[in-house]
Amino acid sequence: MKYCINYSNKSHIINKVDEILIRYDKNKILELFTQFIPAHLNQRVIIQLIEENNIDTIVNNLKKIISIYNENKDIKFDIQLPFYNQKFMEELKDTNLKYFFKVAANSWDKFTGLISQNVSDIYITDELAFELDKVAEIAHKNNIKVRIYPNVAQSRWDKLSDILKFFIRPEDIEMYEPYVDVCEFYGDKAQQIDTYYKIYQEDKKWFGDLQEIIIGLDSKIDSRYIIPRFAEKRIKCGKDCLKNGKCEMCKRILDLSEQLENAHLIVQIDKEKEEDKNA
């Protein structure tokens, strides 16, 4: 799993991450191609054309980028566009540039539609993120990277119980590695993003209330008392709890966590014994 952040000159981890998203600035285009990209040859640089709401402005900026690329194809970068538009596709069709959209797939319809546009990456959100086994299989067959935001509680219905929304605890991030290619943190402050990177990529644990790190959680969920098996089924459950009501795993785990918290008990798995058992 690779990690991606938005560029900020205030970030202390800009040279650590695998991917950098940098917003296109027409006033700094020379600096972008002659200084920034050459300084990050070992990282994937993704130029974002997402600031302008005007389609024609985005097309003109895209033309400038493609023109520079055609003059020097040794420059390595990819492009992120705000959404699908046929005018964008017309400009890109005769290039070898890789591109994807800021818009996410939260349904099979959107997922299939994005695949049809030959994108390099797709963001997966909401209930579709509960079928990551199937999503990843199809995406990888099409040479498409699966991207997720782990630090946001995601649902198309914001009144849904928090425990039924998609999010990833730092303790569970390794379980998602077979299915997720890129982990990108949601936020706009460099210090905040640097902290997320440390928590998820380095520490892989959070001793406390998930409200403090998961955007959109409205209820207290103490990560210390969530049992280690929490993510194992959520990766591929398809949200059966909402389809037939037979699965209540998440709710039961939440109830159990409250009991464990009251008893001051923390459940842990011995990873060495677990590896020996699965060997």
Set out the residue ranges of the language-model regions.
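Active-site pocket-lining/capping segments in soluble small-molecule metabolic enzymes
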Residues: M1-G113, Q117-A279
